[in-house]
Regions:
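Membrane-embedded alpha-helical segments and adjacent helix-loop junctions characteristic
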Residues: 1-61, 209-213
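Juxtamembrane and boundary regions of transmembrane helices in multi-pass small-molecule transporters
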Residues: 2, 58-94, 98-156
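Hydrophobic alpha-helical transmembrane segments
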Residues: 19-27, 41, 71-72, 113-117, ...
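Alpha-helical transmembrane segments of multipass membrane proteins
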Residues: 29, 33, 81, 119-127, ...
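Transmembrane helix-loop junctions in multipass membrane proteins, especially transporters and channels
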Residues: 37-41, 59, 101, 131-141, ...
Length: 213
């Protein structure tokens, strides 16, 4: 889908150094997790990470250590990223509701970034450093260029449906971020985005049956 292509495009432009590639994969996972379920974000990135790892010549202990660090990093950041935005995880919406009902603090979509995004920006590098030290990834000297190009090089063509999804996603996010300017509730914006996907034929009524409600 569109999200996978975005991830591949970023990975293709990443450094070929193992430590930096791992940080890139963790950052992408955290970012995606801000806009979708934590599990879905990990499910998108983990196959890409595993495909790259499989193409690396097996250098024994160092290869296994890097593989473990990469998988754990993606999994950790799938959870951490959900803290970043109001829709990242249902717990955030519950927190906003309780803050409104019990403390009188009204938070709009963009307000949550003040509380959630700093946590993500601090935690992702800390987890990365922890994994580097624990598994010794810094000592691994492997050129990942060919593995990255092999996984990402031929898969970056957007279909019409993916372009539509990308445009609608950007518009919805921009409307969420500017809620204080136009006054349209985040729920209305989300519903309008979903209806737009139906209008352009990107999703069909039958697709609703495959959603894990």
């Amino acid at each position: 889908g569109f999200d996978r292509l975005v991830a591949l495009a970023v990975v293709q432009r990443s450094s070929t150094r193992p430590a930096i590639l791992m940080l890139t994969m963790m950052g992408i996972t955290a970012f995606l997790s801000m806009w979708m379920s934590n599990t879905a974000a990990v499910a998108i990135i983990l196959p890409i990470a595993l495909a790259i790892l499989e193409k690396i010549p097996n250098s024994g202990k160092g290869h296994r250590a890097f593989s473990r660090a990469m998988v754990l990093g993606v999994a950790y950041c799938g959870t951490i990223g959900g803290i970043g935005s109001a829709i990242g995880t249902p717990a955030n919406m519950l927190a906003m509701t309780f803050l409104s009902e019990f403390t009188g603090t009204e938070l709009v979509f963009v307000d949550w970034f003040k509380y959630g995004l700093p946590v993500v920006l601090v935690m992702v590098p800390l987890i990365w450093l922890y994994l580097l030290l624990t598994f010794g990834v810094r000592k691994l000297d492997v050129d990942l260029g060919e593995a990255i190009r092999s996984e990402a090089g031929t898969r970056l063509t957007l279909t019409r449906a993916q372009k539509i999804i990308g445009v609608i996603f950007v518009i919805v996010v921009l409307l969420w971020l500017t809620e204080t300017l136009h006054g349209i509730d985040a729920e209305i914006v989300a519903l309008a985005g979903a209806l737009a996907l139906f209008f352009f034929g990107t999703i069909k009524a039958g697709d609703l049956n495959r959603i894990n409600w």
